[in-house]
Swiss-Prot record:
Active site: 317
Source species of the chain: Clostridioides difficile (strain 630)
Keywords for this protein: Cobalamin biosynthesis, Glycosyltransferase, Transferase
Record protein name field: Nicotinate-nucleotide--dimethylbenzimidazole phosphoribosyltransferase
Gene responsible for this protein: cobT
GO biological process terms held by the UniProt record: cobalamin biosynthetic process
């Protein structure tokens, strides 16, 4: 049995007993029942994930993956492809968006190269390179089935390494010029909607180029004909190495009963791949923010996820997931430290 098969078979639903115990305490807190809103939802979900109403969320990490994309040659992104190579080392150095925010919220960042188009090893970056970028999905499959499984299993492996280091909350992030194109293709395939409905500007594509980007995605879907019910098939035909690796983190976290915080648009696509491999993974996901990218609503509707934040962000990197860490920690602190009606005489 492969690692992917083994992990997928070990994903179970949340612990309802712990959820109920947490709800009972929440209902006794000195506040109108339910008035803490999503704070209460977070606490109940975390209890169900950990199988314990006395859960710990103090040690947090963003796992970020980077890869380049053959479809870049179709003119779907405005920036030079070598930006991936130049920017990604800044993740672990704490110099970019996710690095700075993670530092502020007390989270670590693990940066992993799974497919950057370069030969050199990058400073502060783990080297798990599958190859130097995917193939052009507008001309054929982005990767082989074996490569798709490999990037999923890399994600599982990195997640389990972090869990062994006692990280209790894991967020996902990414870097890859042109990676909104495969992400949009994944969302289009799974939602069944036309690519133009879910195609956005990514990292700053001019609006007059949107139609071209959608046409490239449509062509890729027509040529490759991915099976909308098969996560591995979709990933191999129109995905990306960093997208598959993020999906692997979701699978690894779910099998090990660890909450996984989803970032923005690219990670929605990864979440959909994980969901197609095992629908129970959705129960372990916390959506950090509502991405400003087109296609967001389609993806979140399928996953039935309600983001914690709406910040008009479309940076990616894991920046939104890092921001959400503080909300998760504050929710846990509130749950554990607020007084109950049993403890204080409120005249009830």
């Amino acid at each position: 049995m492969s690692l992917l098969e083994s992990i997928s078979k070990n994903i179970y639903s949340l612990d309802n007993s712990s959820i109920e115990k947490t709800k009972q305490r929440l209902d006794r807190l000195i506040h109108p029942t339910g008035s803490l809103g999503k704070i209460e939802d977070i606490c109940m979900q975390l209890a169900g994930i950990f199988g314990n109403e006395n859960f710990d969320t103090s040690k947090k990490v963003i796992i970020a993956f980077a890869g380049d994309h053959g479809v870049y040659e179709e003119g779907v992104a405005p920036d030079p492809q070598n930006i991936t190579k130049l920017q990604f080392p800044n993740f672990s150095k704490g110099l970019c968006g996710v690095g700075v925010i993670s530092k502020f919220v007390g989270a670590d960042v693990v940066a992993v190269d799974v497919g950057i188009n370069c030969d050199e090893k990058l400073d502060g970056v783990l080297d798990y390179k599958i190859r130097k970028g995917t193939s052009n999905m507008a001309k054929g499959p982005a990767m082989s089935k074996q490569e798709a499984i490999r990037c999923l299993e890399i994600g599982i492996e990195i997640a389990e390494q972090c869990i062994e280091k006692d990280y209790k909350v894991i967020g996902i992030g990414e870097m890859g010029i042109a990676n909104t194109t495969p992400s949009t293709a994944i969302i289009s395939v799974i939602s069944g909607c036309d690519p133009l409905e879910v195609t956005g500007i990514g990292a700053g594509l001019k609006k007059e180029r949107l139609k071209h980007k959608a046409e490239v995605i449509r062509k890729a879907i027509e040529i490759n004909n991915p099976n909308p019910t098969d996560g591995v098939d979709i990933l191999s035909k129109v995905g990306g190495f960093e997208i598959g690796s993020m999906a692997g983190v979701i699978l690894g976290c779910s099998a090990n009963r660890i909450p996984v915080v989803i970032d923005g648009f690219i990670s929605y696509a990864a979440a959909l791949i994980a969901y197609k491999i095992n629908p129970k993974t959705r129960e372990y996901m916390i959506a950090s923010h509502l991405s400003a990218e087109s296609g967001t609503k389609r993806a979140l509707d399928i996953l039935k996820l309600d983001p914690l934040l709406n910040m008009d962000m479309r940076l990616g990197e894991g920046s939104g997931a890092a921001l959400a860490f503080d909300i998760i920690e504050a929710s846990n602190y509130t749950y554990k430290n607020m007084a109950t009606f049993d403890e204080i005489d409120m005249g009830r």
